[in-house]
Amino acid sequence: MPNGRSHFLPESDPGESAKATRGAGVVRARASTPSKGDTRARIIEAAREAFSTMGFEGASLRSVAKEAGVQHQLATYYFKTKEELWMAVMDELAIGFFARLGERIRGLEGVDAPTKLRLVVREFVKYSAEYPQLHRLMTMEGRRESERLAWLIKRHVSRFYSISTKLIREAQATGVVRPGDPGQLHYCAIGIATSAFSLAPEYKLVTGNDPFARSHIEQIADLVCDFLFARPEKDHQRRNK
């Protein structure tokens, strides 16, 4: 990061040099002050942890501001209410996922449905490992009906459900994916994909394994695919008669 000081100050009178030094100090001070984007990002990052560990009721704007290292008044400048901050957190997590998902799907144009489903599953598992807070937050909000849950469903959840079940139905049509209600398969697959990450402290203490190890993430993705692509034995036998 530039420190604002010129490497070659002119050899002028002491007064001019002093002015230049004071000016450089001002520039350095400004350079060390976080930009608006950085400040907002720090607040959202702190809020993401707070909401995903303490829940909406347990977190507060004041505690989030303290964790982010900013004044409470500055936090309220960016987010007038706790609800507004919570929505910003959910938007950032969901929009980030949809951006990754969209890029992946666009890159799979012309690919067969089963392969597309497998690769999208792996993208979802990878994102869930990078941002375990997403499923923790979804689990907290999904426990009871509320305005926040209704907002989430309308704004993000329904969209993902539609994409996911469409991919499942298309892959089922080829005969290589487990038969059954796509909605049930969707939610069961999410459970397999996210549990080790969202319950990471418990999982690590019980199993002794690091859920965020690259090899483990790959294994989880394999498990989700094995679940979706496995067919009941009777169905398999019937199809091969």
Explain the meaning of each model-derived region.
Residues 44, 90, 94, 117, ...:
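Amphipathic, non-transmembrane alpha-helical scaffold segments
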Residues 137-141, 155, 188, 192:
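Short acidic/histidine-centered micro-motifs embedded in hydrophobic/aromatic stretches
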Residues 42, 50-84, 88:
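Helix-turn-helix
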Residues 103-134, 182-189, 233-234:
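Hydrophobic alpha-helical connector segments
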Residues 129-150, 200-207:
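Amphipathic alpha-helical segments used for helix-helix packing
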Residues 53-57, 131, 174:
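Short coil/turn segments at alpha/beta junctions that flank glycine-rich nucleotide-binding fingerprints
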Residues 1-27, 119-126, 130, 158-174, ...:
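C-terminal peripheral helix-coil segments that are non-catalytic and often amphipathic
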Residues 39-48, 64, 89-97, 101, ...:
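Generic hydrophobic, amphipathic alpha-helix propensity
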